[in-house]
Curated annotation (Swiss-Prot):
GO terms under cellular component: cell outer membrane; transporter complex
Modification after translation: Contains two intramolecular disulfide bonds.
Domain of life, per lineage: Bacteria
Protein name per the record: LPS-assembly protein LptD
Keyword Membrane: yes
Signal peptide: 1-24
Subcellular location: Cell outer membrane
The species this protein was found in: Shigella sonnei (strain Ss046)
């Protein structure tokens, strides 16, 4: 009887298309109460080698051809059990066959079960030689997992490789509920290829068929297969009704693609979203090409543009070849500056202000590495399109440590800057930076003494337009040589907190750094790639005030700071606080008249920063940070958040973030000049929450309020209903989507999304709790 068991199990698995990804742990446990479990001891070993036990009221036979068992027939072998009113065993000699053909007929109240499936039906048949099996009018139920259904005839063929269902059905709903089901006139499951082919496929809600396809191919199991994924729909004020129907294409073992027709009612067309992934000897990468043939909204808003085609191309690649070659690509380009305002896309956002196009090839061996790269920017502002690209850039590093007590390094860079505008300055910059370090350390402290030379040469061209409009002139050839000296010392003190908190340990970590860089007037050098760096606590100990090499500020300063940490008895950090400052003995200058605070001639304690983290309990956490810069005359940035987190789906967070307009202007001068919504800085208070609100109902939401503008900045609300066989999600989002220069106010987009997930049939394609929170324009960040 065991010969027919794989048939039944394969049939169940073949049609199940089962996925548990969407089930939360508590819901899964509730659903498991509604499915049968295997209550007999599991038997190990090859089933064909195990004994067969047959119990029946009556038995008769005509050896060796036939045997008949009747009356409460109970046959057991290993973990398998077959019960029926009557079981007939037949054995016949076949012409040309070395062994006789052995078949089994089971009649009346046929019941089969093992540790994976239960089958009930009036009649069954099996060929024990070929393992071909037929089961008529069978009902099946998986054991220990959801999945059940029935078929007029279930057949097993090809040494258990193929399962064929005639008029078969499947649902993952618990017994007594047929909310949805999938039926087909014929279903063929190829276990080896892990694919199910369905003819005359009908999807039914209750007894009502709502979808039909003459042929459908669906992946089964973990093996990647081509086929349609679950569709999605939403409504937005930007595009009105939107519908997605993704198709997954398994091209080869090392490459695949997802092709998604995306219909947008207001745009009057279908955008084709094409994602391609690959893996090669040179690395792994992803390409995305989105294309909208025409856009009637864009035509109305931009009547002077020659084309209304909208597109995006994204390419990300990272790889190592032959252990020494490194290849990296980070490339994003769109058809027009309004693209990310009009279309949601995971590869860019309207708040970024620009898109990066970077290619790099690197070579690295012991003590040496070199990288050749090109970097361009596509600025989204229609008012200021000026941006510099590095075409190309060469970076070289050579290290030689343990030269006596010293570590040495030589860094070199050569780069050519090109502007998108023909009238802006351009330059070739060559930089050389030799460094020597003397590191000393023991168990409780360290001190590092460093000396370096910063030598830079500029060859600037195309200066006429700039020099004719500015009192400070740029020179064609500029040399800048600056020595730098730094001493950085750290200590770590530790004590047990037995009196206050037994088992806890506190550390005290003071740090002091002296930095000296002489002043060099850099007003004759145009600023190609420098901007003010953020001064959080760790940033206080940087060598540079500005990123890039065009502005290197003079320094005669001492940075001091202290960090204290508290660890519990499991060495988990429960609390830390850091406070530091920079004390300037002389003014930090570059000679650039465009940097307003250099005219104030300020010295003393100018920059303060502090960070803290407190893990109050396993469920409560608090983080915060503040940076005060007297050069900007105020608090530059600050942030804080407090969170209660019970698990992934139960959390509440309150947060606040602030950035002064002076800080934004100093760190992002080009973006600040066009980003009208940030002219008054950023001051936003927010709340994020996710929580089950009733039996099988849960809610997720986020709300941010701009205290400067006294209006909502962003909000999102999602509601989900989950059952054992389906889930429904409805989401609403209102987000900032640009600035109207004519009316001088922010533009918002409202979106309503709707998604259905079928438990046991679909993958988790819709928005889950974490996905919804992180898809927000102000994404959720964990405080714990």
């Amino acid at each position: 009887m065991k010969k027919r068991i794989p048939t039944l199990l394969a049939t169940m698995i073949a049609t199940a298309l089962y996925s548990q990804q969407g089930l939360a742990a508590d819901l899964a446990s509730q659903c498991m109460l509604g499915v049968p479990s295997y209550d007999r001891p599991l038997v190990q070993g090859d089933t064909n080698d195990l004994p067969v036990t047959i119990n029946a009221d009556h038995a008769k036979g005509d050896y060796p051809d036939d045997a008949v068992f009747t009356g409460s027939v109970d046959i057991m072998q290993g973990n398998s059990r077959l019960q029926a009113d009557e079981v007939q065993l037949h054995q016949k000699e076949a012409p040309g066959q070395p062994e006789p053909v052995r078949t089994v007929d089971a009649l009346g109240n046929v019941h089969y079960d093992d540790n994976q499936v239960i089958l009930k039906g009036p009649k069954g048949w099996a060929n024990l030689n070929t393992k071909d099996t037929n089961v008529w009018e069978g009902d099946y139920q998986m054991v220990g997992r959801q999945g059940r259904g029935k078929a007029d005839l279930m057949k097993q063929r090809g040494e258990n490789r193929y399962t064929i269902l005639d008029n078969g059905s499947f649902t993952s709903c618990l017994p007594g509920s047929d909310t949805w089901s999938v039926v087909g006139s014929e279903i063929i499951h190829d276990r080896e290829e892990q694919v199910a082919e369905i003819w005359n496929a009908r999807f039914k809600v209750g007894p009502v068929p709502i979808f039909y396809s003459p042929y459908l191919q669906l992946p089964v199991g973990d093996k990647r297969r081509s086929g349609f994924l679950i569709p999605n729909a939403k409504y937005t004020t930007t595009n009105y009704f939107e519908f997605y129907l993704p198709y997954y294409w398994n091209i080869a073992p090392n490459m695949d693609a997802t092709i998604t027709p995306h219909y947008m009612h207001r745009r009057g067309n279908i955008m084709w979203e094409n994602e391609f992934r690959y893996l090669s000897q040179a690395g792994a990468g992803l390409m995305e090409l989105d294309y909208l043939p025409s856009d009637k909204v864009y035509e109305d808003e931009h009547p002077n543009d020659d084309s209304s085609r909208r597109w995006l191309f994204y390419w990300q690649h990272s790889g190592v070849m032959d252990q020494v070659w490194r290849f990296n690509v980070d490339y994003t380009k769109v058809s027009d500056p309004s693209y990310f305002n009009d279309f949601d896309n995971k590869y860019g956002s309207s708040t970024d202000g620009y898109a990066t196009q970077k290619f790099s090839v690197g070579y690295a061996v012991q003590n040496f590495n070199a990288t050749v790269s090109t970097k361009q920017f596509q600025v989204f502002s229609e008012q200021n399109t000026s941006s510099y690209s590095a075409e190309p850039q060469l970076d070289v590093n050579y290290y030689q440590n343990d030269v006596g007590p010293f570590d040495t390094r030589i860094y070199g860079q050569a780069v050519h800057f090109v502007n998108t505008r023909d009238d802006m300055p351009e330059a070739t910059r060559v930089h050389l930076e030799p460094t020597i370090n003397l590191p000393l350390s023991n168990n409780w402290g360290s001190i590092n003494t460093e000396a370096k030379l910063l030598a830079t040469h500029y060859q600037q061209t195309n200066l006429d337009w700039y020099n004719s409009r500015n009192t400070t002139k740029l020179d064609e050839s500029v040399n800048r040589v600056m020595p730098q000296f730094k001493v950085d010392g750290k200590m770590v003190f530790e004590r047990d907190m037995e009196m206050l908190a037994p088992g806890y340990t506190q550390t005290l970590e003071p740090r002091a750094q002296y930095l000296y860089v002489p002043y060099r007037d850099q007003s004759d050098i145009y600023n190609y790639d420098s901007s003010l760096l953020q001064s959080d606590y760790s940033g206080l100990f940087r060598d540079r005030t500005y990123g890039g090499l065009d502005r290197i500020a003079s320094a005669n300063q001492v940075t001091t700071g202290v960090t204290s940490r508290i660890y519990d008895d499991a060495a988990v950090e429960r609390f830390n606080i850091s406070v530091g400052q920079i004390y300037y003995f002389t003014e930090s200058r570059t000679g650039d008249d465009n940097i307003t605070w250099e005219n104030d001639d300020k010295t003393g304690s100018l920059v303060w920063a502090g960070d803290t983290y407190w893990r109050i309990s396993e469920r409560w956490g608090l983080r915060g940070g503040i940076q005060y810069d007297t050069r900007l005359d105020n608090v530059a940035t600050s942030n804080s958040s407090i969170e209660y987190r019970r698990d992934e789906d139960r959390l509440v967070q309150l947060n606040y973030r602030y950035a002064s307009p002076e800080y934004i202007q100093a760190t992002l001068p080009k973006y600040y000049s066009t980003a009208e919504q940030y002219k008054n800085g950023i001051s936003q208070v927010g709340a994020v929450a996710s929580w089950p609100i009733a039996d099988r109902w849960s809610i997720v939401g986020a709300y941010y309020y701009d205290t400067n503008a006294n209006k909502q900045a962003d909000s999102m609300l999602g509601v989900q209903y989950s059952s054992c066989c389906y889930a429904i999600r409805v989401g609403y989002e209102r987000k900032l989507n640009g600035w109207d220069n004519d009316k001088q106010h922010a533009v918002y987009d409202n979106a309503i999304g709707f998604n259905i997930e079928l438990r046991g049939l679909s993958s988790n394609y819709g928005l889950g709790t974490q996905e919804m929170l992180r898809s927000n324009i102000l994404p959720y960040q964990n405080t714990l």
